Amino acid sequence: MNLEYVQVVQKFNQVLLELTKKVCTVVGGSKPTYWYHHIRRVCSECPSMPMSMIGPYLNVYKSQILTKDKNFFMNFDPAHNEYTFIIQKLKEAARNMPEDELEQYWVKLLFLLKSYIKCKPFIN
């Protein structure tokens, strides 16, 4: 496996963890819809992140994670290992996608990962 790819994914995991902690602190994790919109707002503050790329990515979150696992976000505690659950859900979402959609998904995801690394508005 490409080392650069692995490093990018590791960085994304870190960003996702920090963002999740921040968002759950802000909205208490009790209303997934607000969680979704808060992420959208945070992403929109990043100049290298085109809005056209944010929408499809967040829709994966919204449809595959937030609507099915509201209780998880209500009880989120970064001190425990719920972060692993988020990654697991992302992988499950990817497994359920048709092959052509999956390829598009990973292309978009990699683009987003690189954008996240270039601008760090959420790693405070």
UniProtKB/Swiss-Prot annotation:
Lineage: superkingdom: Viruses
Keyword annotations from UniProtKB, A to Z: Late protein, Virion
GO cellular component: virion component
Reported induction: Expressed in the late phase of the viral replicative cycle.
Subcellular location: Virion
Major location (coarse): virion
Family to which the UniProt record says this protein belongs: Belongs to the asfivirus H124R family.
Protein name listed in UniProt: Uncharacterized protein H124R
Organism this protein belongs to: African swine fever virus (isolate Tick/South Africa/Pretoriuskop Pr4/1996)
Lineage of source species: Viruses, Varidnaviria, Bamfordvirae, Nucleocytoviricota, Pokkesviricetes
